[in-house]
Amino acid sequence: MANRTHDTAQRRRSEHSSSRRRRRRSRSTIYLILAIVVFLVPVVLTHLQNNEQHRVAEEFSRSVEQLAPDERNGMLERAREYNDRLPEFGAPDPWMYGPDTNSEAYQDYLNQLNVNSVMARVQVPSVGIDLPIYHGTSTSALAHGVGHLYGTALLVGGEGTHSVLTAHTGMSTLTMFDNLTHVKKGDDIIIDVAGEKLAYRVDHIQKVLPTQVENIRPEVGKDYVTLVTCTPYGFNTHRLLVRGERIDEPEHIQREYHSPWQLWMTLAVGIAVLILLYLLWRWFADRRRDKREREREARERQHEREARGENRGENHG
């Protein structure tokens, strides 16, 4: 009788211990699944937002194509006349100064090259940049794409023009100009504006202080476009300037769009995959462990039954 009571108590302790292990495994599994979600959600959101910006840029190009040729030519002509009226230079830094948005001059600016509130489209195929360009560098403009720096030439090209485009880096769910640091001399910048495609080849890359504006001034006889963003990441004490000079558009320019992929995305997906592989390994390991425990408990129960049978035989004897 004493042996039977001892065996029963031992079995209950074993079952209680197994139950606690299962609860711990369930909690840790939930935590690991949450970790996968935490790592993957920013990647998915960024990818979706990037594709949405690409869609807006594509929609702009389609809207321009639907305009009558005379209307497109009129937009280009008015933009060139606007550039001829520009002073030598406008605002020195898009993040430090802002224009009087209520002025007549600014309202005239907003009416230039305006197709569904979008001015143009910029592509840098080598690093996957494909973004709509908006008028000015307001918070709203820079939250949705690239801003054209008011006071610099409109994006219609021509000798003595220098257009400046700005965008953020380090946004939580948008790539924007994050990959501008990977652009190299010789890469191409394509501007799609009012039905024309202007090609620029990167010839100068520089980091400057916000007050150093001489490198974004126009030069006689030159046709430039400069892409600007804050650097270094997280500190934003300087500006990265990537300048391109106008070229005849070569046939080999890449046009196919690829959603930009960054190192942090690769790391996040890699960590999530490792966690998933660990969960799968542990699931198989737990199944084997549970199977061994069930077999052990079955043997113990069989041993108890045999022991009880022997005890009954002795008592009858």
Language model regions located:
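Acidic/Ser-Thr/Pro-Gly-rich, low-complexity N-terminal segments
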Residues: 1-20, 297-317
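Solvent-exposed, non-transmembrane regions of membrane-associated and secreted proteins
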Residues: 16-264, 289-304
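Alpha-helical transmembrane segments
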Residues: 273-287
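Core hydrophobic alpha-helical membrane-spanning segments
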Residues: 33-36, 270-277
